[in-house]
C-alpha cells in the first residue's frame, strides 16, 4: 500500500472455526501495518445463540447460553493466550456472561420487545470475538484495542434485527476515533454487524447485510482499501479498492 493508506480487513466466521484457523487470522493481522480489523462472531456462535432464542425469547435458558459462550471461547483462548492476558480476558468475558445471565429481569419487565432482546443477546457473539482477538494480538505484543460498533456510534434506523446504517451520521461519528487510533500505531478491532438506534439500543444489520464500514467505503467517503477474507484454508484476499 502507498503511504497514508489504511487497509480494512473483514474476517468472516469461517475464518474463526478453531484454534488453528484463529492462529492464522492472528498471523495475517500481525503482518499488516496501518489496518482496521472488523470481526464476525466465531463460526457457529450466532447460529447457536439464535437456536437458544428459539420461539420464545422470554423463556430462553440464559445460563445455558452463558455456559455455551464461555466454553466455546475459552477452548480457543486457552490455546493462544497465556498468563495475565488470559486472566484479563477471563475477567472481561465473565462481565459479559454476567450481563447475559442477569438479563432475565429485563425480559420480565419488557416481555413484548422480542426483536430488541434478540438483537441484544445476538450481539455478544461479535463482542466476545473482538475481545478475544484483541487479547490475542496483545499477547503477541501488538497495540490492539477492541471497539464495539454501537459504542462508536454506528447509527441505524429500521428494525432491531435488520437495521439500515445512517451513513452520514455514522461516518462522522467513527472516522476520527478509528483513524486517530491507526495513526497512533494501534490496531482497532471492531464488531461488524452491530449498531445502535437513536435511543441507544443495540441493533443488528442483519446476517445477510453488508457490515457497517463497507457501507461507508461503498460511498467512497474514506480513503481505504477493503479486503474481505473468506477462505478458511487459503485466506485469499478479495480486494475492492475504494479511492
Can you annotate each of these PLM segments?
Residues 1-243:
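Nucleotide/pyrophosphate-binding catalytic subdomain
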Amino acid at each position: 500500500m502507498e503511504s497514508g493508506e489504511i487497509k480494512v480487513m473483514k474476517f468472516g466466521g469461517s475464518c474463526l472455526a478453531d484454534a488453528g484457523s484463529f492462529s492464522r487470522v492472528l498471523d495475517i493481522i500481525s503482518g499488516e501495518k496501518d489496518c482496521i480489523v472488523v470481526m464476525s462472531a466465531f463460526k457457529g456462535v450466532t447460529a447457536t445463540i439464535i437456536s437458544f432464542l428459539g420461539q420464545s425469547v422470554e423463556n430462553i435458558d440464559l445460563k445455558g447460553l452463558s455456559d455455551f459462550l464461555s466454553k466455546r471461547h475459552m477452548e480457543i483462548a486457552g490455546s493462544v493466550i497465556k498468563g495475565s492476558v488470559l486472566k484479563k480476558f477471563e475477567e472481561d468475558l465473565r462481565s459479559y456472561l454476567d450481563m447475559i445471565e442477569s438479563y432475565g429481569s429485563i425480559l420480565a419487565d419488557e416481555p413484548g420487545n422480542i426483536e430488541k432482546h434478540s438483537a441484544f443477546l445476538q450481539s455478544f457473539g461479535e463482542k466476545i470475538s473482538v475481545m478475544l482477538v484483541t487479547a490475542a494480538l496483545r499477547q503477541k505484543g501488538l497495540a490492539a484495542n477492541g471497539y464495539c460498533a454501537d459504542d462508536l456510534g454506528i447509527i441505524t434506523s429500521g428494525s432491531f434485527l435488520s437495521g439500515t446504517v445512517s451513513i452520514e451520521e455514522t461516518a462522522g461519528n467513527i472516522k476520527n476515533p478509528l483513524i486517530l487510533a491507526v495513526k497512533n500505531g494501534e490496531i482497532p478491532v471492531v464488531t461488524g454487524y452491530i449498531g445502535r438506534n437513536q435511543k441507544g439500543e443495540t441493533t443488528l444489520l442483519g446476517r445477510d447485510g453488508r457490515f457497517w464500514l463497507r457501507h461507508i467505503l461503498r460511498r467512497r467517503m474514506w480513503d481505504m482499501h477493503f479486503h474481505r477474507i473468506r477462505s478458511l484454508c487459503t485466506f485469499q484476499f478479495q480486494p475492492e479498492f475504494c479511492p
